């Protein structure tokens, strides 16, 4: 019913965006919205690479702004995600984007705080519970060394030192206090 009042229901994915009020909702309401979005348009899958298994959650849309809105909502719940442009899709003429949650802690947080109605299976929960999700991911730093010195510039704009980048509060490297 809410989707109808906000003129979201019945729109194509490329035309959808979230009303500003969503970003003021309680965590519980945001979790319910994300749950239903991922239940309808999202996926959860087990990716197998060698002996390791990892879980991937995702949602896709040709609307990059919408993907960034979803990413911001996930960030507020402590769930990290990445947006990728999908290229060379035979059926898709325009640009297409996938938002993916793959980091084990973010996947676990998503499943426990938000869930995907009707899509989470016991096998997904077992992989997370056993701590074997995404075991071989990442890189191991063996050595840090200086290769060359580069110039770095800091540009400050008075009274605008703090700002949001991809939904996270950040600041320039000046002397501002967050």
Residue ranges and their predicted role:
Residues 1-178:
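Internal intein/HINT superfamily modules and their associated LAGLIDADG
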